Amino acid sequence: FQRWQFDTVYGPANTFKTFSTGKIQYAEPDKGLFKVEEILSYHAPVSAATKPSYKAIPGVHGEYWVCDGKSIFEYDYNNQKLIQQVLPAELQGQNIINGPLPFLFGANAADINRRFWVRAITSPTAKKEIWLEAYPKSAQDASNYQRIHIIISTEDFLPKGLVIFDRSYVKGKNHSRTVFSFQDRDVNFASTFDKLNPFFRNFYEPSLPSGWQKVVHAAPITRPPTRQATQNPNTPR
């Protein structure tokens, strides 16, 4: 993928703050990988006659996480730690779909409609594309973004683009948003030799880099909701 991040508050006013490239992979029911392989940051032009440049900053790394269906593994480059978050049993097998961006990780229409108000916004000039606009229904999703535009290719019916609008986005005033473009889309099929398939091998526990520390967080304990005692109808009031 290619990713452009716009930040009106901490970035330039008229262009993107960072440009990244990387890969996203997904395998049913709940295996996923998100890896930023290169991130370039905005550098202001040295004079009015020159253009801004984008350069890699030493020590700055993008996101890298893997979900194997039972745990999420995240690389913390700043602290040289591989963090494993074990998922509660009731979330294993469905964590990615319930995450912030279900459009990329196999959510079905029922799940999408449960979490979002969705409408078609395809322009008459769009070629071989379907554009959808999704507004979050829950406070949890609304805390992550204001709305999302999903661009679907009619050739393979896979997402070819995604625009995630920041909560503070205001057209003409605040352009904070994240734009994804998915160019090399591919569908891989499972087989009985998954462990020998390089595509599926990415979803097993990632290796620990030399000199790094592995940190394991146990699954959080989910407690049943507290029931309120019903009042005895014979109790005097």
What is the predicted function of each stretch?
Residues 40-42, 79-83, 140, 166-169:
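Short, surface-exposed beta-strand-loop junctions and turns on beta-sheet-rich folds
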Residues 126, 139-146, 154-237:
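Non-transmembrane domains of secretory- and envelope-associated proteins
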Residues 108-119:
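A short, amphipathic edge element
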Residues 37-39, 75-78, 87, 137, ...:
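Surface loops and adjacent helix of pleckstrin homology
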Residues 29-35, 126-135, 158-163:
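Short, hydrophobic/aromatic-rich segments at coil-to-beta transitions
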Residues 23-28, 53-55, 65-68, 146-161, ...:
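A short, surface-exposed beta-strand/turn
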Residues 1-79:
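N-terminal mature ectodomain segment of secretory-pathway/periplasmic proteins
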Residues 73-103:
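Acidic/charged, solvent-exposed loop-and-adjacent secondary-structure segments enriched in E/D, K/R, S/T
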